[in-house]
Amino acid sequence: NPTGMVYTKAELEAIAEVCCRHNIYVIADEIYCNLVYDNNEFVSFASLGEDVKERTILVNGVSKSYAMTGWRIGYSASNPALAKVMANYLSHSTSAPSTISQHAAITALTGPQEDMQVMKQAFEQRRDHLVERMNKIEGVSCIKPEGAFYVMMNMKGFLGKTMYGKVIESAEDFAQLFLEKGLVATVPC
């Protein structure tokens, strides 16, 4: 997240083994769990065993899979002791989301899931189209993400080159020119 990489069960098990051996807790951001492509399998970190589950703080929400950004509905699952501490902190740091947002999230999570699958297919088609087009641009490359809806582009081939009278010295320069000349917004990193 947000590179779109999907860890295999074996990779997660290796991470889990280290975490259990050293008593490390993991915050597992599973917000993109329903947006996995190309027959990749999403594996929840907490599903890897009781020891792992005890050390996992799972966070998720409805903003990505259900296109409910702005509704501000997220949730967490953890062992009871951690959940109590988080609930105490939350009760003093923020107010509750609106009632309508809560009911909308319940409906999204418990209702028919067909629309989410249609949205996922559209995201996958857009990803394929974007990656194919990006990799045809000289000086640009990108890896096909296995999940989420971002594409991380490598534009190092443009560094030091002049475009539209401006020398591209950084990712920020490239992003600004891309926005001004191509009307495409990017986030340099």
Residue spans for each PLM region:
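PLP-dependent class I/II
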Residues: 1-189
